[in-house]
Amino acid sequence: APWLFFDAYIDCNVDEICFHIEAYSKTVTPHEQIMTTSRTVDTVDYQRLEKDIYYLKTHDIKPGITLNPNTPPDVLNPILNQIDSVLVMSVHPGFSGQSFIESSVEKVQTIRQSFHGDIKVDGGVNNTNAKKLTDAGANVLISASYLFGSNDYKTAIDLLR
C-alpha cells in the first residue's frame, strides 16, 4: 500500500515518487508465489491508482510507475498521460544476485513508442546492456552492483555511457 507512505515522503520535500503498479492489483497473488518471484498484475484498480496520482500532483510531486519484470507494459496505457516516469525493473525486486532479464529491453522499446517521459531501468544494468537499453529508449539507468563491484568507478561509469 504505497499510499500509506506518500505523506512521509511529501514531508521530506521529494520531487518524485515511483511506486509499483502491482500494489493496485485487483487480484491477490498467492503467498507461495510471492516468495519465489515478484508480483505481477493483470487487473489494475485504476480508480485508486488515478486518485493517488492526482494526490501526488496536488503536492507538486512527479508520479512515476514501477513495473515488475512479469507485468506487461500495456497496463500503463490508461495512465500514461498522467505520469512523469516509468521504472522498469529488469530483475525481480528483493532477490539479490540476479542476472539482467533481457526481455526488459523490448519492454522499454514498447513503452517508449507511446510515452515521452523518463524511462528508468533498475536491476542488472552494466556495460554489456546499457547501450541496448538507451537505444530502446531508456534515459535513466540505475546501476548499483556493477558500479560498487568495480575498482574504478570513473571507468565503470564511462563504460555505461
Q: What does each model-identified segment do?
A:
Residues 34, 69-71, 75-109, 113, ...:
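Glycine/Thr-rich beta-alpha phosphate-binding loop at enzyme active sites
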Residues 17-26, 87-96, 136-157:
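Glycine-rich phosphate-binding active-site loops on the catalytic face of alpha/beta enzymes
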Residues 9, 86, 111, 122, ...:
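Conserved, mostly hydrophobic/aromatic
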Residues 15-18, 60-66, 85-87, 118-120, ...:
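Structural preference for beta-strand elements that scaffold enzyme active sites
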Residues 1-12, 71-83, 125-141:
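Catalytic cores of alpha/beta
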Residues 1-56, 61-65:
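Glycine/small-residue-rich loop that forms an oxyanion/phosphate-binding "nest" at active or ligand-binding sites
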Residues 41, 52-66, 102-123, 159-161:
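Alpha-helix-loop-beta-strand connector modules within alpha/beta enzyme cores
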Residues 1, 22-24, 66-70, 91, ...:
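Active-site beta-loop-alpha junctions enriched in small/polar residues
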